[in-house]
A protein has these predicted regions:
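Conserved N-terminal beta1-alpha1 strand-loop-helix module at the mouth
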Residues: 1-81, 85-88, 92, 165, ...
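Short, well-ordered coil/turn segments that N-cap beta-strands
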Residues: 13-17, 60-63, 89-92, 118-119, ...
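Conserved, mostly hydrophobic/aromatic
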Residues: 19, 65, 96, 121, ...
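Conserved anion-binding
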Residues: 24-39, 101-189, 208
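Conserved alpha/beta-domain cores
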Residues: 47-54, 58-66, 187-199, 213, ...
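Active-site-adjacent beta->alpha loops and helix N-cap segments on the catalytic face
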Residues: 71-85, 102-108, 125-142, 190-204, ...
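A C-terminal functional module that forms or caps the active site or interfaces directly
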Residues: 185, 190-235, 239-240
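C-terminal helical cap(s) of enzyme catalytic domains, especially alpha/beta-barrels
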Residues: 224-231, 235-267
Length: 267
């Protein structure tokens, strides 16, 4: 089970940190792009050079690596090499895919995710089919982490202010996570995500559910909110991978997180 892998590696690495891999090219955005030193004439080599170096630099202080599909479209061979490097460094590999489709299409995605040897992936429940996807994923030894209350400001409109069966959408989703036995929730730590929301999600999902926590860094997420979570996995992205010294930066964040995590989780 993904939960067991998380516990083992978190203990081995003494870490609850996940690193997001979002390797942006200059034409994709104006700031936070791959530094010049990684560039090659071949875009594939550029993406791979950057990704592998970041993985190696942060590996001492991280539990997992989460490449975002949107930055690797058309490059499954790169993702396979990334996963191998992640596993070689003793970490978990999570595909940030936000899968959301009908059963047959989801099944096709699971085939490729498994073939690339990922340990888990993110799933968007908006289209439904959560139960079937979780069952099929577990049959393939894949973990499913469900978008529950995301960190971006627009998420408040859909996930907090929108109701399903008389309750906030995020709480409805948390109940779905418990009912379907999904492995985790994606939950934000940004300003609109109140402590009470996180407590409600934790209470609803129950034990053995991993919280992939987002928003610390440029989004202004609050690290102290992880105190409300039993099994946190804190995502860091731009603040680390585009820093001058990713290894030193991720170590700094680890020291910060230790203040808000139980001694048993981070000693």
């Amino acid at each position: 089970m993904f939960y067991d892998k998380y516990l083992r590696i978190s203990k081995e690495k003494n870490s609850i940190i996940n690193i997001n891999l979002d390797p942006a090219l200059p034409k994709q955005r104006t700031d936070n792009t791959i530094p010049d030193k990684y560039y090659s004439k071949d875009i594939r080599e550029t993406l791979l050079n950057f990704s592998l170096d970041i993985i190696e630099q942060v590996s001492d202080y991280c539990c997992s690596i989460k490449p975002n599909t949107q930055y690797y479209l058309g490059h499954t061979e790169i993702l396979e090499k990334i996963v191998k490097k992640v596993h070689d460094e003793g970490m978990l590999a999570i595909l940030d895919h936000k899968l959301s489709d009908i059963g047959a299409s989801n099944g096709s995605a699971l085939y490729w995710i498994k073939k690339m040897n990922f340990d888990a992936f993110t799933f968007s429940p908006f289209a439904g089919n959560t139960k079937r996807t979780v069952e099929k994923a577990h049959d393939n030894n894949l973990g499913v982490i469900v978008l529950t209350l995301m960190s971006n400001p627009e998420a408040e409109k859909m996930m907090v202010n929108t109701s399903v069966n008389g309750e906030p959408y995020y709480l409805y989703t948390a109940k779905t996570v418990k009912k379907t036995k999904a492995d985790g929730c994606v939950v934000g730590l940004t300003c609109f995500v109140e402590d009470e929301y996180i407590k409600k999600i934790q209470h609803t999902t129950g034990d053995k559910v991993i919280f992939l926590l987002q928003g610390i860094g440029p989004q202004g997420g609050q690290a102290n909110k992880i105190r409300n979570v039993q099994y946190p996995l804190v995502s860091l992205g731009r603040a680390v991978i585009y820093s001058d010294d990713p290894k030193r930066t991720v170590k700094k964040y680890q020291d910060i997180l230790k203040k808000y995590c139980s001694k048993e989780r981070l000693d």
